[in-house]
Amino acid sequence: TRSISATGLFLLIMMTVGLYSCTRTQKDIIPSADYAPYVNAYTGGVISQNSTIRIELTHDQPMVDMNNELKNTPFSFSPSLKGKAYWVSNNTIEFVPEEGALKPGTLYEGTFRLGDFIEVDKKLKELNFSFRVQERNFTLQLESLPITATQPNEINIKGDIRFSDVVKKEEVEKMLTASDGKK
């Protein structure tokens, strides 16, 4: 009975450690309602790996230099992202990550220096937010595989492949292969 107790205790400890590690996932950052008078919208939730990150202010800003890169980006991210920031309207700043910079399944924590554009209380000078890049998944559905008596060595394969996010044609072609089982 002693070995059963030791085994049971070991399993209980392993289950506890496993549950604890599962609950220690990164949490989304949701900005305080104190930002509502200054920020209409921000990029959050789950986004595509080809998305841009935007902050929409509640009021138009005078004298913005539209569609030209900002010299000092007001954004910072963890993990780090390389890219450029632009005014896309009088009240919206957009960060455009370099191609391939957003990694599927990754939670990013962003900081936007709101105090650079609007006079706000000291505690509101930086807007912290988060977003997660969608995991890459796909489904493959094949139609029946007809083999004809006139051409028993040939088969025509038809089907649909659907991805959870935008994928380049070249990447799909690399995924698909066909073989007759011979070397």
Label for each model-derived stretch:
Residues 22-183:
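Acidic, low-complexity Ser/Thr/Gly/Pro-rich repeat segments typical of extracellular/periplasmic
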